[in-house]
């Protein structure tokens, strides 16, 4: 008897397309939505459901790569208006331990910096920022948490030497609220992507291998990986260099002529209205500006409000900014 089975299956995906889906999945580890965009860039139109079936059929569906859709969050209107900054925390073990430093543009999601670090001490972190500033310019604002190295736990005021160095570039610093990681939602979400990428590509076995790995991940994230929040575009398509250039020898602050300007002593203290007040040890010998608000005064260093002081009791506290995400 002759078989009635058709010689070809009209619903079977072209083998070349299936092979390409598998190649892209193995290369990046991304889901069907992103792979669909990559294929379209190559002139291959494949339905999302078909890509998912190929992934499942070839045993490539790994639950850890499935992510929840991004929440709609606050977004700055232009590049370099604000960068979000964070240390990922320990990745790897032993001599391969690494704490990646991430610097992300809020508007475009462009990753201006991704550096392997072993320590949160001043010099290596400052060098990473300086390299970023020399490559991309200076942002208006940096958003960060209350962690070391930008938040100096050794100082009553919380300011660190790194914070002061950053402010000398006339960058306004904004610190997220305590226990509010969602304030830095974009860089926190990137850290989830980073962790998945490292697992997919393989965790380095020595510290020296982190640098090329992070460079590859950064290149893919900025120029290849489609972003849902950007209508499946890439961050590089929306990012522009800052017009503000890095100044290796910044001048002293220039405050408005009507301002009350005081020099902080070598212990971070100053006198105002008969009160001995504290600014920050990290601001020793620097010029600060005082702005009165009824019974309190706000201390500014350059364009960043750093502390709020009671003119009745002399007690001071960190200046609290409204939360943004």
Language-model regions, residue ranges each:
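Mobile-element integrase/transposase regions
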Residues: 45, 49, 55-111, 118-140, ...
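A structural microfeature
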Residues: 112-113, 307
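A generic structural motif
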Residues: 117-118, 194, 283, 312
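Acidic/histidine-rich, metal-coordinating catalytic segments
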Residues: 133-156, 177-179, 184, 231-235
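Charged alpha-helix within mobile-element recombinases
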Residues: 162-247, 295-297
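C-terminal, beta-rich DNA-binding module of retroviral/retroelements integrases
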Residues: 220-325
């Amino acid at each position: 008897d002759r078989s009635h089975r058709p010689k070809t299956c009209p619903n079977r995906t072209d083998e070349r397309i299936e092979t390409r889906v598998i190649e892209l999945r193995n290369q990046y580890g991304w889901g069907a939505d992103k792979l669909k965009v990559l294929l379209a860039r190559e002139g291959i139109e494949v339905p999302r459901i078909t890509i998912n079936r190929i992934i499942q059929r070839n045993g490539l569906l790994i639950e850890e790569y499935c992510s929840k859709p991004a929440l709609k969050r606050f977004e700055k209107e232009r590049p370099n208006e604000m960068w979000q900054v964070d240390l990922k925390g320990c990745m790897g073990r032993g001599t391969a331990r690494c704490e990646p430093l991430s610097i992300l543009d809020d508007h475009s999601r462009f990753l201006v910096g991704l550096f392997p670090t072993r320590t949160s001490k001043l010099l290596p972190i400052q060098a990473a920022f300086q390299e970023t500033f020399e490559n991309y310019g200076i942002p208006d604002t940096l958003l960060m948490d209350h962690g070391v190295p930008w938040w100096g736990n050794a100082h009553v005021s919380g300011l660190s030497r790194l914070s002061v160095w950053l402010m000398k570039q006339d960058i306004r610093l904004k610190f997220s609220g305590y226990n509010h990681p969602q304030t830095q939602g974009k860089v926190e979400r990137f850290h989830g992507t980073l962790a998945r990428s490292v697992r997919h590509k393989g965790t380095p076995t020595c510290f020296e291998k982190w640098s090329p790995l992070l460079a590859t991940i950064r290149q893919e994230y900025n120029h290849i990986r489609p972003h849902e929040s950007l209508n499946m575009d890439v961050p590089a398509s929306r990012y522009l260099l800052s017009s503000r250039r890095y100044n290796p020898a910044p001048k002293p602050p220039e405050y408005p002529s009507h301002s009350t300007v005081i020099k902080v002593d070598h212990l971070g203290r100053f006198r105002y209205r008969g009160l001995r007040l504290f600014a920050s040890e990290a601001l020793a010998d620097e010029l600060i500006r005082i702005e009165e608000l009824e019974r309190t005064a706000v201390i500014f260093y350059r364009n960043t409000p750093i502390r709020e002081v009671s003119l009745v009791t002399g007690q001071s506290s960190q200046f609290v900014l409204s939360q943004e995400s």
